[in-house]
Amino acid sequence: MRSRTPKVLHPLCGRPMIDYVLDAAIAATGTRPLVVYSPATDAVRTHVAERADTALQDVPRGTGDALRAALDALTDDVVEVLVLSGDVPLVQADLLAALLEARALDHAAISLISVDALDPTGLGRVVRTEGGTVERIVEDKDASDDERQITEINAGLYAIDGAWLRRRIGSLRPSAATGELYLTDLVALAREDGRLVAGLDVDDDGRLTGINDRTQLARAEWDMRVELNDRWMRAGVTMQDPSTVYLEHSVQLAEDVTLEPNVILRGRTVAGRGTRIGAGSRIIDTVIGEDCTVIASVLESSTVEDQVTIGPFSHLRPGAHVGRRSEVGNYAEIKNSRLGEHVRQHHMSYLGDAELGDDTNVGAGTITANYDGVRKHKTVIGKGVFLGVDTMLRAPVTLGDGSKTGAGAVVTRDVPAGKLALGMPARIREIRKPDDAPAPEAAPAADGADGADGADGPA
């Protein structure tokens, strides 16, 4: 893999590949798995700790030695051992159940899964007797020319009689070529003991291919994604171009959700009935309600209630909560803020550490200046507030219900309910009603003097 990350922790559709193997093992056996790790892969032990027991293989000396380490960690009452590879994430529980059943029916010492491979190059061949029973497994480098013509290969999945395995694991001998102990040599030992080795031959559908490099990882993820997308479409989700839709297994989608091309949904994202996710959207750990529209936007760890429109080019950062029927438009950013119902933030503004009441309008260019260089401060905006374009709200600050700000206002102190804030810094004024008489025009101020209304900057 050419990576500092242990191979089995590389992700497929949002989960480390070993998680899928553990899922299959638990579903097939109903027991807690045991994972063998080495000192170089201690991250594997940490990752699986909640779901599996672990055993340390001090010095990696091959698959047979790994199985020995596992046996040392198992109790004596274990009567059957199912051996899986952590790098075969597409393995299915029903296949493992069939493997266990095959051993039980034949009273075999070992049952194994083999595959008729289209290209067996580099893989261990399954050699059978004239009667069709498994005689031995020969590695590619040790195979004769005739044996290399065999297309039946060992898939590396085994069910083994526990009592027999304990007696014979010590009989494994190091390979002359590598010095390693091969698990596959157990097949020959079983035949020496006159025990049957059952082979379960399956078609090569790609599910049992081990992952050893990034190319194989990408192919496995593609196969998994095709299956996942097909499952959601059969459940009532529309995908206009499934080949460009990327979903992780933890995502939940309701009926009549529509996903346009080039959509990425990750983590614990949820989309409610009738919601449409537009092309180019990237959504992570976000709950979206019903009948929403998201257009070419990024949403992270946020909550979006019903009938909300987001985008294009909006960014909801962690902690954003957008109320029903609200509208968040182009180049609008929200972080750790709660918007009430029917809030309009249509263009080019930033709301951080803020709380907005229902029916508030956020003018273009509005910014909550929430950071003083040391701490974040909160902005509270009431119901029915109208924020003029280019309003700067220096937190901490509160704007009461029904208040307004003029264009370019820099609000540095609280604005009472129903009042108007004008200027830089803003001064508080009464809101003039449409039927009020206009105020007399002020005389122009001298250069360098305050405006005619006594406020700094433009009057």
Task: Describe each region flagged by the PLM.
Residues 22, 30-32, 47, 71-72, ...:
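Catalytic cores of nucleotide-enabled group-transfer and carboxylate-activating enzymes in metabolic
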Residues 294-459:
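Glycine-rich hexapeptide-repeat left-handed beta-helix
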Residues 11, 15-101:
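Conserved N-terminal catalytic core of the sugar/cofactor nucleotidyltransferase
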Residues 245-247, 251-320:
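Acidic, glycine-rich loop-and-beta core segments that form the ion-binding/anion-interacting portion
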Residues 35, 82-83, 110-113, 199:
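Structural beta-sheet core signal
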Residues 18, 70, 87, 99, ...:
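Residue-level signal for inorganic ion chemistry
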Residues 42, 50, 91-177, 184-186, ...:
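Conserved core of the sugar-phosphate nucleotidyltransferase
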Residues 151-254:
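Conserved alpha/beta core of the MobA/IspD/sugar-nucleotide pyrophosphorylase nucleotidyltransferase superfamily
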